[in-house]
Amino acid sequence: DSQYNPLEMSLLVDALHEGVDAVNGYKLTRNDSLFRTIIGRAYHNFVKIFFNIHIRDVDCDFRLIPRRILDEIELQSVSGAICLELVKKIEDAGYRFAEVPVNHYSRKYGVSQFLVPWRVLRTLRQLAVLYWKLVIRKEHKRKLS
């Protein structure tokens, strides 16, 4: 959908150094509709409070995560909640993120699936399941021990 500039990947590579295990981008300016921007901010606040996420933009899809980390993380989500699950499990495994500002562009291709009603319901359901598994039961931490 061309919402990120692939040339900015070099910024993430430069941020990956000793003491940093993975790099997550964060949108300098979100180029979405006002409604989508408001929903996005509410979502970020929600995940920071309820999931204790430490990065500022959990749904920025511009990341650099070494394969060795991905091999340790078992993902189960099949909706937009997968970004939250990925970041939460990486943080809880003790890995450290660096954050890099990246440009975010208006979608050039395709149509956002974000507000399709059945997808929203599926994501809300998966958020509830993730909260139960990752915050209440801490199932993933038992597997890491």
Where are these regions (language model features)?
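A short, conserved alpha-helix in the catalytic core of glycosyltransferases
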Residues: 69-73, 79-96
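The conserved acidic donor/metal-binding loop of glycosyltransferases
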Residues: 1-3
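Acceptor/aglycone-binding surface of glycosyltransferases and processive sugar-polymer synthases
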Residues: 6-80, 105-129, 138-142
